Amino acid sequence: MAGLTVRDPAVDRSLRSVFVGNIPYEATEEQLKDIFSEVGPVVSFRLVYDRETGKPKGYGFCEYQDQETALSAMRNLNGREFSGRALRVDNAASEKNKEELKSLGTGAPVIESPYGETISPEDAPESISKAVASLPPEQMFELMKQMKLCVQNSPQEARNMLLQNPQLAYALLQAQVVMRIVDPEIALKILHRQTNIPTLIAGNPQPVHGAGPGSGSNVSMNQQNPQAPQAQSLGGMHVNGAPPLMQASMQGGVPAPGQMPAAVTGPGPGSLAPGGGMQAQVGMPGSGPVSMERGQVPMQDPRAAMQRGSLPANVPTPRGLLGDAPNDPRGGTLLSVTGEVEPRGYLGPPHQGPPMHHVPGHESRGPPPHELRGGPLPEPRPLMAEPRGPMLDQRGPPLDGRGGRDPRGIDARGMEARAMEARGLDARGLEARAMEARAMEARAMEARAMEARAMEVRGMEARGMDTRGPVPGPRGPIPSGMQGPSPINMGAVVPQGSRQVPVMQGTGMQGASIQGGSQPGGFSPGQNQVTPQDHEKAALIMQVLQLTADQIAMLPPEQRQSILILKEQIQKSTGAP
């Protein structure tokens, strides 16, 4: 025996060790080591754990420095009570403990197979999966680290090892899935791709290798293993599943942009949605006018077309795609409520004469309306409903006196561009028809009342009082020294009381320009010099006057006070109650 000990360290180690059974499950190796150190120094104490559950099996092995100490432990500690149980201490090399030595892998000659007990091929995948899942994360990481080094240093040997031990390859793949190194879908493809490899393998791994990469075993493994790897096969679908999903979404999304613009840009009212503006930018098929609109915005207020849809002859409706507000920044052009928008030279036929804004000496009643709209305006009256309160021109010049505010400050505060435009898109969009009637009647009546103080055009129909075009001939004295039709030049020289006059003249300008387009004598030379800023001022004042009480309440205190003062002064000047 001594010779065997010298020749075989494994046998010597088994002789120096004792088998300890009937160990309480809650016992720790340290506690047992303290007990067995009573008979002599303990080299190590190892508890045996179940590979499937990770729980202790209730027995272990204690190694001493020599065989005599081990024999002493068997004599003195056998039957020792610990936590209510009598420990069983026996020779570790006895025949009845061979299986325990096998499971420990101590290297004793009694171990016949390095693969453990033989299992059926059908159970191999589940057994391997459980064994891998029972490994602590640190040990699993260390295993993968060592395998990586092995593959890097000796790729051919590692390949041969994995081919000869398919259960090891399967376990490594399972570990990679558990550690989320490999997607479950990819793992399945790898397994199925290796179905023909087991034919190259022969020898003792036969019982287990069929369970490794074999196709039947693969299926059973994935069916039987309800653990994280299998669960990840659902959550990990994004690795291989995402491209089809993305393709599907792209396929579904390709027609969508083409269909949406057609639905949105078709009718004028529907084009109110801001999304229409984005679609117009994309330039989808079926909305030819939209792409044109983005490049050159016609001079028609989209709200007029939106409200009644009766202006196809003189207005391209797609302008409404970009929002209800004439000053909608998405429209790319300032379309003030007065309709006087700076023509960039791309909006009117050149033969119709230069725009009113750019040629001060031009007779401003006849041609400018045609020029601003790209064609004659047979029916300008529907535009009367344009100057709605929530659509203040946010880029107009200062209000000149009522608090010294600049409407651009209003724009900066988001008074009109956001709060009012939002209200215009929602509440005003719903009352488009009601607003039309109200603007055509109430505002027209107010316009006539206020215009009566400036002109003798009481007989002019309210329908002709559009906010576009130059002012009609001065048929009556205009108070406060304002120029007849160009009181829009009110700037800073017009008193607040008379400031309403330019507004009303602005409302009557279109009617006069259309109805009296052949009355050049009604204007003085200086009255032709109407600038876009003048019209913007008039439009801004008209918009301010049309703000509802709710809209005014939403404004900052300064702006609210200024608007209230303006309204009060206008009411006083017009004698309104």
UniProtKB/Swiss-Prot annotation:
InterPro entries: CSTF2_hinge, CSTF_C, CSTF_C_sf, Nucleotide-bd_a/b_plait_sf, RBD_domain_sf, RRM_dom
Region of interest (12 X 5 AA tandem repeats of M-E-A-R-[AG]), ranges: 410-469
Crosslinked positions (Glycyl lysine isopeptide (Lys-Gly) (interchain with G-Cter in SUMO2)): K189
Start and end residues of each stretch annotated as Interaction with RPO2TC1: 514-577
Residue ranges of Sequence repeats: 410-414, 415-419, 420-424, 425-429, 430-434, 435-439, 440-444, 445-449, 450-454, 455-459, 460-464, 465-469
CDD domains assigned: RRM_CSTF2_CSTF2T
MF-aspect GO terms: mRNA binding; RNA binding
SMART domains noted in UniProt: RRM (SM00360)
GO terms classed as biological process: cellular response to nerve growth factor stimulus; mRNA 3'-end processing
Annotated ranges, domain RRM: 16-94
Disease cited in the entry: Intellectual developmental disorder, X-linked 113: A disorder characterized by mild intellectual disability, and developmental delay mainly affecting verbal and non-verbal communication skills. Motor development is normal.
Subunit structure: The CSTF complex is composed of CSTF1 (50 kDa subunit), CSTF2 (64 kDa subunit) and CSTF3 (77 kDa subunit). CSTF2 directly interacts with CSTF3, SYMPK and RPO2TC1. Interacts with HSF1 in heat-stressed cells. Interacts with CPSF2, CPSF3 and FIP1L1. Interacts with DDX1.
Protein name (Swiss-Prot/TrEMBL): Cleavage stimulation factor subunit 2
Gene: CSTF2
